[in-house]
Amino acid sequence: MQTLIIDGQDLYGQKDLHDYLAKALGFPSYYGANLDALHDMLTSWQTPTTIYLVNLDALSEHLGAAYSKKFLKLLLDVEEKNAFLTILR
């Protein structure tokens, strides 16, 4: 079981978010660092993983409200499709 904490206070933009996820989850070098690429990676994820979301207000502030909302929706959508992922906030 893998555990990942996404702390909105530690991520200061979209690049930080995608760099963090790529490193923490061991994404391949061809990872596109955008929401479509993240969706593709997470829907095919095969390792039992729990992702904890903390400081969501800071995440929204740092990513921008619209991008943060899309990111959170993506995580919840992927959680429904992939039994290996659990999203907790």
Locations of the language-model features?
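Positively charged, polar, low-complexity stretches
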Residues: 1-89
